[in-house]
UniProtKB/Swiss-Prot annotation:
Protein known as: Large ribosomal subunit protein uL15
Organism this protein belongs to: Thermosynechococcus vestitus (strain NIES-2133 / IAM M-273 / BP-1)
Region of interest (Disordered), ranges: 1-57
InterPro entries named in the record: Ribosomal_uL15 (IPR030878), Ribosomal_uL15/eL18 (IPR021131), Ribosomal_uL15/eL18_sf (IPR036227), Ribosomal_uL15_bac-type (IPR005749), Ribosomal_uL15_CS (IPR001196)
GO molecular function terms noted in the UniProt entry: rRNA binding; structural constituent of ribosome
Biased composition (Gly residues): 23-35
Its job: Binds to the 23S rRNA.
UniProtKB keywords: Ribonucleoprotein, Ribosomal protein, RNA-binding, rRNA-binding
Subunit structure: Part of the 50S ribosomal subunit.
Length: 154
């Protein structure tokens, strides 16, 4: 094979359409735009989303408000009532809750919520506490220790 033997594959190089250069060219006179009308005029025929005068979809739908936060904090949550099964004076972490079978996953950082009653003194390590959870843990004689989010998610 020599350099002069190289040629493009058949059908790979199509000629550019020469529009409006006489009827023999196949695209003469109206240039493929049909007869009169808005779509045959110069410039963009209609705006994006135009539905022929019908009320368009973007105007039929309500304006959406209250979008969710883009970088919303996602937590693995647990209520203080579930911590009653743990032994007194123990340190509660994500790992200890997984080993005790109280949590099934540690995908997200831990947040302790305040539903239920707590009768056991515990040292709870979590990324976040609700106000009622913090008061219930401290009322039972326990300690709330806020850990960094990165430490919990590892």
């Amino acid at each position: 094979m020599r350099f002069q033997d190289l040629h493009p594959q058949a059908g790979s190089r199509r000629r550019k359409r020469r529009i409006g250069r006489g009827i023999a060219a196949g695209q003469g006179a109206s240039g493929g735009f049909g007869m009169r009308g808005q779509k045959s005029r110069s410039g963009r025929p209609t705006r994006p989303g135009f539905e022929g005068g019908q009320n368009p979809l973007y105007r039929r739908l309500p304006k959406l408000k209250h979008f969710p936060l883009v970088k919303r904090k996602v937590y693995t949550t647990i209520n203080v009532g579930r911590l009653n099964t743990l032994p007194a004076n123990s340190v509660v972490t994500v790992q200890s809750l997984l080993e005790a079978g109280i949590l099934t996953t540690a995908k997200y950082p831990l947040k302790v919520l305040g539903d239920g009653e707590l009768n056991v003194k515990l040292e709870v390590h979590a990324a976040a506490f609700s106000g009622s959870a913090r008061s219930k843990i401290e009322a039972a004689g326990g300690v709330c220790v806020e850990t960094s989010v990165a430490a919990d998610s590892e």
